[in-house]
């Protein structure tokens, strides 16, 4: 059944973009993913990433799939967090081009899930301050923090197993960092849905 599904989806993708698609998992199709997805799907996507990381790191998820995907309240709900706040520092990484900035910051590599009040408190912070907010939250969020990698042998093994050398702490977050995170998510999604 998987072969039939892959065949049909590649045919549909080819028709839609007017270009032959060889595989349903091509980075060119994933590169700009984010803005075009509804919020619940984004939460589902990151819940699956979180579950994959937890399994690979031989630990339990910090939140359940149900909580990550369905809870939306201001106290216990999970919300989309933009790593790049809408401020002058973030905009400067895009040479002041606000349209480009808004497109880029909404890609999957530029967002995470944060619990209600954490998300509200980090809303317009500078990136260096956001890193503190990400401590102790979800595993995917913590991969931005350098201290997450210290003495974390399971994570080192995970990076080697999936050839994710670029997955490392980021003391600054700019356009290149966002692209790196997008590529990492593509590799992880390819593993989850392969």
Per-region residue spans from a language model:
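Intrinsically disordered, low-complexity N-proximal targeting/linker segments that flank membranes
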Residues: 1-104, 108, 113-114
